[in-house]
Amino acid sequence: MILAKCCHDTDILTWLVGSPCREVSSFGSLAHFNSAHKPDGAPQYCLDGCMHRDTCPYYAPRFYLEHPKAISDGFVSVVSLDPSHEAVLHALQRGPYGRCVYQCDNDVVDNQVVNLLYENGVSVSMTMCAFTEHCERIINVMGSRGQIRGNMESSTLEISDFATGNHTTLHVHTPSGGHSGSDAAMMREFLQTLRSGRGSKTSADASVESHLIALAAEESRLQNGTAIHMKEWRTTV
């Protein structure tokens, strides 16, 4: 999960800290989306007459057929390339996105915490959780002279100065497009690098490091939170 969804977070965190990561520890599990929590009598597919459709928060048709932003937010395109009601309905009847969430072969965690210790002494705590109303990123940077809180959904940065007591809120422009404009920006940067012959603003080594941290987090999780020493562990992968 951390590699798939949070390796860019470890990338940004490492850039902010400005130091190599020294140790990683992590805990996480598939706590809820498993057969132990399956409602009694629930069929394998939501559309096979599930008696819990009005009470189950994960009833698939509610998200892909009834949600007002199902198409605009891109949910439907994952289920079916044809966004018509009939096509999506057919895909949910026997496709993977129409299965009961408690009866899938998923082995990916639904919650995970990662602790990072950097060579310069900075420590980081990162939490990934599936159970949240808002799918957003929140960062809280706590320093000796101030604090910065960032909220990706509201596109704001809140800056607090301990010495003066001043509080400043910055509203950041968020471009449209995939990953808040990052997909197009990465392609532009890649093409400019090829055309100019100059190096990229971010190195391949930095990208690899963010992936290694994510892999180390999973290694630690599988070892019940045992701390992974990055300098030694890098030589084994």
Regions found by a protein language model. Name each.
Residues 2, 103, 196:
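Generic anion/oxyanion-binding catalytic loop in active/binding sites
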Residues 28-32, 101-104, 129, 205:
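Short, solvent-exposed loop/turn elements at beta->coil junctions and helix N-caps
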Residues 1, 5, 106, 182:
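Soluble or luminal CAZymes and related metallo-dependent hydrolases
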